[in-house]
Amino acid sequence: MKDTIRQLIQQALTRLVTEGVLPEGLTPAIQVENARDKTHGDFASNIAMMLAKPAGMKPRDLAEKLIAALPADEQVSKVEIAGPGFLNFFQNTAALASRLDAALSDPQLSVRKAGAAQRVVVDLSAPNLAKEMHVGHLRSTIIGDGVANVLEFLGDTVIRQNHVGDWGTQFGMLLAYLQEKPATSDELSDLENFYRAAKQRFDESEEFAERARGLVVKLQAGDAECLTLWTRFKDISLSHCQQTYERLNVKLTPADVMGESAYNDDLANVVNDLKAAGLLVESNGAQCVFLEEFRTADDTPLPVIVQKAGGGYLYATTDLAAIRYRSKVLKADRALYFVDQRQALHFQQVFEVARRAGFVHEGMQLEHMGFGTMNGADGRPFKTRDGGTVKLIDLLDEAQERAYTLVKEKNPQVAEAELRSIAKAVGISAVKYADLSKHRASDYSFNFDQMLSFEGNTAPYLLYAYTRVAGVFRKLGTPFDASKGHIVLEAPQEQELAARLAQFNETLNNVAEKGTPHVLCAYLYDLAGLFSSFYENCPILGAENPDQQQSRLRLAALTGRTLKQGLDLLGLETLERM
């Protein structure tokens, strides 16, 4: 609808230029927003205030001329002037109802991408291997997955890339410890304890640390024995990761893994190509790129180091190799990096180096989708009581157990197997939604009691809202036929629900553009609240006549499908009953 209004305004502007009311050459960005007060319209534009000065007119006078120049459109019932010169558009309820009827009959719910489909690389999760995933990996994994799902639903070709840390000092440390204490497969499967023991030896013994560093060199040189053991550790670690992904209901698979080691053979080429492009400068024996726009606090150039004095490579080198691969081989139009906000400077520098070196094709977008920190109740990074790192799998276990206790209290008569199934959906969804519903750039405090509440903007509330819709159709007694009848919007609650349903397409396009799943969460929460008001004020099964009942059933059906689709895109499992 906003696009329609923008087009109408553009046609009016063109007409006013032709009539000499407006000067030629104006190219304003036409802004159309949802009106806050629906009694004053559904949409508002400040275009008259934007162009009043170049037109040499008062904003309200220009607004009157714009209204007179607007072409008629069946989707707009009237346009009014408000305040200093806002244009308020009222949408035609019959046209709105017709759009919702079309959405109900469309598997895509009338959702279409605003623009051409693209090939999009989504870089997400990226845990360091050799130990189990911890809570610090949650945000990248689920935010990236949610955005990837939305992009796919809109028609983009999405290439998930799990850039795992599968190379480096930690593997030398593990190999050295394995030489000292040969372990069985069962012992190795307990990666956390094995890693902890190896790390303790590394910290306490310089001789052990030296041997570990030597094994890293052998590994990088392609030593067969080291590579065999490294592969064993990597496979065990990836198996742990995959179990966690499945628990989280994210779509990452082993085929999406493209770790640091995948780019090893190209790192020397990256350095050579940077040198050939005239970008490299030697500084204290290291190979660096200096970009004028990046400087330290004392105004000295800030280097991007791509090769250490000893010949070793750094994260920047690997990231540059990955960028080139994603551009030249994967042919990506866009690459989204869901990585901690604290890496913002790193990515700004690496992206600029990649562009100057010609590693990305013209028009390719490189975007760092940074996120804040998950904190504990004390406002500090989330830790165990003894100050250790919280394993992600332990967090999910506790969420499920807490959800089980909660659900059992409310439904003591439900069979044990069903209770466990409900608890799994509620517990995992609660953890994910508590994160996804916050702006990704914000820090937030983890609180089990808040996230498991059935009130407020939480997963349990939304899951229950969906079961409430499903309950309407269970009580109907006969299969609902979506091909019959039409939506008619009479009551205010019907109109408000319908207007929000019509914004699903816009909402998903916003998520795709900005990488912000919290926008979808806010939409679904809003929708659930509007359905509740509709349900309480507009009898569905007790409607006044069959036509009204079918209209309201159609509204309920579209609400249910929209809620389910939205929750599914966020990676949340819906339930038919709770």
From Swiss-Prot:
Cite the Pfam families for this sequence.
Answer: Arg_tRNA_synt_N (PF03485), DALR_1 (PF05746), tRNA-synt_1d (PF00750)
Q: Which NCBIfam families match?
A: argS (TIGR00456)
Q: Where in the cell is it found?
A: Cytoplasm
SMART domains, A to Z: Arg_tRNA_synt_N (SM01016), DALR_1 (SM00836)
CDD domains the record matches: Anticodon_Ia_Arg, ArgRS_core
Task: Give the protein's recorded name.
Answer: Arginine--tRNA ligase
Keyword Iron-sulfur among UniProt keywords: no
> Which gene produces this protein?
argS
Where the protein is mainly located, per its record? cytoplasm
Q: Which family does it belong to?
A: Belongs to the class-I aminoacyl-tRNA synthetase family.
Q: Where is this motif: 'HIGH' region?
A: 127-137
Q: What is its EC number?
A: 6.1.1.19
UniProt keyword list: Aminoacyl-tRNA synthetase, ATP-binding, Cytoplasm, Ligase, Nucleotide-binding, Protein biosynthesis
Q: Name one GO molecular function term.
A: ATP binding
PROSITE patterns referenced in this protein's UniProt entry, alphabetically: AA_TRNA_LIGASE_I (PS00178)
What Gene Ontology terms describe where this protein resides (cellular component)? Answer: cytoplasm
Q: What is the scientific name of the source organism?
A: Pseudomonas syringae pv. tomato (strain ATCC BAA-871 / DC3000)
A Gene Ontology annotation in the biological process aspect, one of them, is:
arginyl-tRNA aminoacylation
Q: Which reaction(s) are listed as its catalytic activity?
A: tRNA(Arg) + L-arginine + ATP = L-arginyl-tRNA(Arg) + AMP + diphosphate
Q: How does it assemble?
A: Monomer.
Q: Which EC class does it fall in? A: ligase
